[in-house]
Amino acid sequence: MGVFAKGDVVIASLSYSDFSRRKRRPALVVATPKGLDPVLCLITSKMRGDEYDVLIKKTDFATGGLRRNSNARPCHLFSLDPRVIDYKAGTLKPEKIKEVTAKIVEMVT
C-alpha cells in the first residue's frame, strides 16, 4: 500500500487470534522501525474496560477518522507487512498518540 507513520490509523484484513477467519479491522501504527514492518495496535469498537484501553473519539483525529468511537488496545501489539494494509483511515492528533504510547510503556514496565 505505501509508507505509514506513527499515528496513522489503517484498515487491514486481520486474522482472529485462533486463525479461524479474517476480518477487516482498524489498527494504529505505533512504531515504524527502519527496514522492518510497522508495529500496530489493535483498535476495536467494543468497550471492554481493560485498564490499558485508550478511548479514540472522532475528535481525536487530525485527519480522516473512524465511523464510531473506538478503543486502542495496547495489549494487542503486532507487526504487519504493509502490503496487506488496505488503506489509511486517518491520523490521530499528537496528544492522543502520546496517550497510547504512554499506555504501552506503562504496560511493559
Model regions: which residues?
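Short consensus segments that form the blades of beta-propeller domains
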Residues: D18-S20
